[in-house]
Amino acid sequence: MPALAQPGQRQTLKQAPVAPPSPPFLQWFASFLRQELKPYPGRAVLALRYTVAATITMLLIVTFRLPGAAVGGFFSLLLSREALITTLRGGISTIASFLCGTAFLLIGAILLVDYPLTHFLWVILSFFVAFYGLSAMSNYGAGTAFAIVIVLSVPAWDQAGPQAARVVANLWVLGSVALAVTVTIVVEFAFSLFDTRDELTEGLDQRLEAVRVVLKQSARRAVSPEAMGKLAQFAMIGVSRLRRLALRPNPARQDTARLSTTVSLAGRLVDILAPFRRFDTLTPHDAPRLQAMADQISKLQRKLHARNDKQVIQPLRTPSDGPLILLGLEQTLDLLRMSLSPAPDQSFALDQINPAPPTILKPDAFHNPEHLNFALRGCLASTLCYFLFNAIFWPGLNTSLFTCVVTAVTSIGSSRQRQLMRFSGALLGGVVLGIGSQVLILPMLDTIAGFTVMFAAVTVVAAWFLTSSQRLSYFGSQLALAFYLIQLHGPSPQTNLTIARDNIMGIMLGLVMMWLVFETLGSEPAVQVMRELFAENLHLMAEYARPWPQGKPADLRKIRTLREKISENFLAVNSQADAVLFEIGRARDQSLAVRNRLRAWQPQLRSLFLLEVALLQYRLQVSPRDLPASIVRAGTHFDNEVCAVLEGIARAFRLADRSCKPHDIQMAYADLEHAILDAYHNQPPPRSRAVLEISAQIIELACRLLAEINAAPFSGAPPIRK
């Protein structure tokens, strides 16, 4: 069994290279800003698209004096720009959610606001429904729109005046949002006529090229600062945008599971090499290995562009020892080769499991207690804000409710990150740019043309931040929102400084309440959420690996649900990894160390899942009745052993339990190989050879991951909840 020789050797490898100790927070944050704000290919055009859409929306709303101008301008920046189809779907979802929120609000208001007790209960119920929708809706953008329309409209019903006027005001806000969505879709369509680039392929190629250049230069012992700087920028930007692009259905490319794995592995290559600075420790004997890896990346780049190329790229022949940096790069590069260049007859698309139809709510919307806990905490924070600004008769503080919505997340790190970005965005957009323009610029403007130039200039700044990675893009949206709330408060430019004061104080009130409620009532540190998600994925993958009966619709639905949940957890782990960077305190260094380890294991787990998907496809495409009984028994035994190994890895990760040994799964593979060769007289068909190849790769990855987790237990880390 040559395929199993490699796992046995690599089990004894040391932990893959880990990033060096992190610098102090302020030093890291300064470097973070420098890297995030550097230009990259396509960034200027993307920022221009944001600016054009927001500016046209502003001109139409101001020209026709529509209420809700600030909300309309904000939603022109909120829609996704990943592709025209995603913008269209996001726009439709936003309008539908806004319409549902408006209908819920108006029905409740008309029925309940006339009596003080029912009015107060209606306010609490509205806040609860808003936050429950934010947590339980499958589309986060739609959930945000649903929650925003409720929390923005509730305070309006506390004011005196005829009901008809308040109903009309709510409907005008809906009209402003619909106008902003329409303008954004039209602008994206216009730009799509001139931009035919494949952003996903281009982004992957740029990252692979940056790694290839550094490897080639290090083989010659002459690494340039420019090459390392470009690599560091890609490491700082991350691959979150590429992950979202990979999830976009496109029949011209590979399936989304394989593309997501490719993106993760390309990002891992960058993450391994970017922090490395000790090139002087590499000897001349390492130069051939470095050059071989650079050549392998060139082949992978050609494979990436030649989508219909059936040529299989052969693995590198590398020694099993040497510097840890080289071992980590070679392992990741081999996983990338498996993802981009699968063996003949090896498919990764599970054709029998069609994508689930899009649903408004998440599958666990009504039985996951986390949604209820989240809604209760969000409702409490919003109710406290509402009670306070009504008690002191300061209605201008109602922006605190908006702050509660846009900073509400489930973990401390993510919440802290959003609160920091919300406050700093409001400070720059509201105080510096908003009040500054009111005092210094607006008195000199007397035409819409001058106001448009000022508006576009501020939007360009916000759009540049918006085109950063997810760690900083939120700051751009909050900068724009704070500026829009001041300058688009009425049908004409505002010179009243009390508007800016009220907005800033409202934001502060919302941040204080969110801190009190979310960080004192059970929110977990982001690194703890990362660990729980990673462990949950191990258990879900173990369940996915177990034998499945053939052809039962209930089983197919269960498989589809498992796939979707595992993919969601992969994305959530990466999102929480970004949030860990914003956690402070004595445990920050330990949290960053845990984060680095999880990010190192994440691509391996993704690759293992990809192989599970491929293996299950072969199981489902052939009826057990059409196979020899010996192969069916051996295949079932092997699937059970894969399930057992993954559960063993989960125990090793959760409890530092090192009792799991790979001997049983290797014996199960030997039985499967013997059954196939014996049944087909040593000439198995291509499908059976592919099953053996995938099974061997699963063993290799599982053994490697188990060895690395056993070699690096989380000493001193808090236990994971069961």
Could you say what each language-model-derived stretch is?
Residues 439-443, 448-449, 456-461, 468-495, ...:
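C-terminal functional regions that serve as terminal interaction/effector modules
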Residues 23-32, 48-88, 98-103, 120-189, ...:
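Pore- and pathway-forming membrane helices of multi-pass small-molecule/ion transporters and channels
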Residues 413, 423-431, 714-722:
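C-terminal structured interaction module
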Residues 75-76, 375-387, 397-408, 423-435, ...:
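Alpha-helical transmembrane segments of multi-pass membrane proteins
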Residues 418-422:
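Hydrophobic alpha-helical transmembrane segments corresponding to the first two to three helices
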Residues 107, 111-121, 443-449:
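Membrane interface segments of multi-pass transport proteins and intramembrane proteases
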Residues 184-196, 516-527:
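Juxtamembrane or sensor-core-proximal signal-transducing alpha helices
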Residues 2-47, 51, 59, 63, ...:
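Long, hydrophobic alpha-helical segments that serve as membrane-spanning/inserting helices
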